[in-house]
From Swiss-Prot:
This is Histidine ammonia-lyase. The modification 2,3-didehydroalanine (Ser) is found at S142. Keywords: Cytoplasm, Histidine metabolism, Lyase. The keyword Nucleotidyltransferase does not apply. Contains an active site 4-methylidene-imidazol-5-one (MIO), which is formed autocatalytically by cyclization and dehydration of residues Ala-Ser-Gly. The gene is hutH.
């Protein structure tokens, strides 16, 4: 169970909810502020002054006054009318993270919902009731309306949810877990669907996967350096200190530790006629380290957003209920674009290392395509082509999405963030990157084994052994698709990087 303190939840807590499926609830100290804001909304609902989302219509219809007798129906209609999502459903782990993020936003005490709403979300997370949420339909302002409406629909006994491995109507799913639908009070429907939690959940998932890929890239690239008999001189600490970028310094230090004690490296420290290695070997800290810095910048933005009140209107500390624009997911869109750039570049330089290792004119005496009998066998020829295809896909997907605004809702919502699909694409990019890195690991392992009797370092030897437990050495040609998939799994689970047994940079 993760106890979330609104405004102070950590990325580690959010990753545990996403990766391990932990339930979450708000810290008890959040309750007084939540209930105070709810009381203020109830007071406004009983008055005559127009308050957006309490006794008015929504969006372009905000100028239309709603009769007091219709305010409950207003909130229910809002949820039903906004359930317009299409496409495949969100992954359950990401949907649960979205629910936890909504808890955090409501817990800031600025949304005006009753504690009953918070308790139902907590109960759904604890009982494993996960709304089925179509993943397409949000433009990231005014919040992630359609996907969050599908979440809220289950809370009022509509929509669909998964529970116990079964997909059920919303009311039945709640009943299965011993929960009851809630009747929405003033503003509560709006508070549930206004916010950036869908986009932020997807962006955080991409961040967590991206960081794991960056760690794997450091380990695998060190193995590639040994396979190619690359120089470790460019890893010297002073080079990186003279530039000063934290990620670059960490990347170089990690690679130095990984390569320490390599007999392959010692064998060509003297007398090597190559003056400089290609950039994909020599500039690894500068590229992967820069990607790490970018991922950390995105992490800072997303950590702030995860703890933010992104509702509209907001109940301020002086009791005023004021319309604003915190629902606009521009920060999330920028963060998603940054993550996409980092993923693309990690993959781009990894693909060049794959190309280097299979090319006999560049690989420093490795056999063509890393096969012991070239000609009769094609070896890793087409595995390299696959990495090129995936690299190109990722380059295409790395184009910014946040710049692609379009007006919606009769021009009332005339600038939007497109953060939702900017964050969603990260999942596919990570899948591609894992295959690129896994294929690099296969090539590097094959290359290092061709250097026998010389051996790599102890940490990298352990990495090679972990890979070989899943992917046998390539001799005669065989179907390689299962090998590429197995290596990609080792990247995505973190097992390959952990096998080195050394500390790796932390997010």
């Amino acid at each position: 169970m993760e106890i979330l303190v609104p405004g102070r939840a950590t990325l580690a807590q959010l990753e545990a909810i996403w990766r391990e499926g932990r339930p979450a609830r708000l810290a008890p100290e959040a309750r007084p502020a939540v209930e105070a804001a709810a009381a203020r909304v109830a007071e406004a609902a009983a008055g005559t002054a127009p308050v957006y989302g309490v006794n008015t219509g929504f969006g372009k219809l905000a100028s239309l006054k709603i009769a007091p007798a219709d305010t409950a129906q207003l909130q229910r209609n809002l949820i039903l009318s906004h359930c317009c999502g299409v496409g495949e459903p969100m992954p359950p782990s990401t949907a649960r993270l979205m629910m936890a993020l909504k808890l955090l936003s409501l817990g800031r005490g600025a949304s005006g919902v009753r504690w009953e709403i918070v308790a139902l979300l907590e109960g759904m997370l604890a009982a494993g009731v996960t709304p089925v949420i179509p993943a397409q339909g949000s433009v990231g302002a005014s919040g992630d309306l359609a996907p969050l409406a599908h979440m809220a629909a289950v809370m009022i006994g509509e929509g669909e949810a998964e529970v116990g491995g079964r997909r059920l109507p919303g009311a039945a799913a709640l009943a299965e877990a011993g929960l009851a639908p809630v009747a929405l009070g003033p503003k509560e429907g709006l508070a549930l669907i206004n916010g950036t939690q869908f986009s932020t959940a997807y962006a955080l998932a991409g961040l967590f996967e991206g960081w794991r890929a960056a760690q794997a890239a450091l380990v695998i690239s060190a193995l590639s350096t040994d396979a190619i008999m690359g120089s470790t001189a460019p890893l010297r600490p002073e080079i990186h200190a003279l530039r000063g970028h934290a990620g670059q310094i960490e990347a170089a230090a990690t690679m130095r530790a990984l390569l320490e004690g390599s007999a392959i490296r010692e064998s060509h420290r003297e007398g090597d006629q190559r003056v400089q290695d290609p950039y994909c070997i020599r500039c690894q800290p500068q590229v992967t380290g820069a990607a790490m810095d970018v991922l950390r910048m995105a992490a800072g933005t997303l950590a702030t957003e995860a703890n933010a009140a992104t509702d509209n209107p907001l109940v301020l500390s002086d009791g005023r209920i004021v319309s604003g624009g915190n629902f606009h997911a521009e920060p999330v869109g920028f963060a998603a674009d940054m993550i996409a750039l980092a993923l693309s570049e990690i993959g781009a330089i990894a693909q060049r290392r794959v190309a280097l290792m299979v090319d006999p004119t560049l690989s420093f005496d490795l056999p063509p395509f890393l096969t012991p009998e070239p000609g009769l066998n094609s070896g890793l020829m087409i595995a390299e082509v696959t990495t090129a295809a995936l690299m190109s896909e990722n380059k295409h997907m790395a184009a910014p999405t946040v710049t692609d605004s379009t007006p919606t809702s009769a021009n009332q919502e005339d600038h939007v963030s497109m953060a939702a699909h900017g964050a969603r694409r990260l999942g596919r990019m990570v899948e591609n990157l894992a295959v690129i890195l896994g294929t690099e690991a296969i090539c590097a392992a094959q290359g290092v084994e061709f250097r026998a009797p010389l051996a790599t370092s102890a940490p990298l030897g352990a990495v090679l052994a972990r890979l070989r437990a899943e992917v046998p050495r390539l001799g005669a040609d065989r179907i390689l698709a299962p090998d590429l998939a197995a290596a990609a799994r080792l990247v995505r689970t973190g097992a390959l990087a952990r096998a080195a047994g050394l500390p790796l940079p932390a997010l």
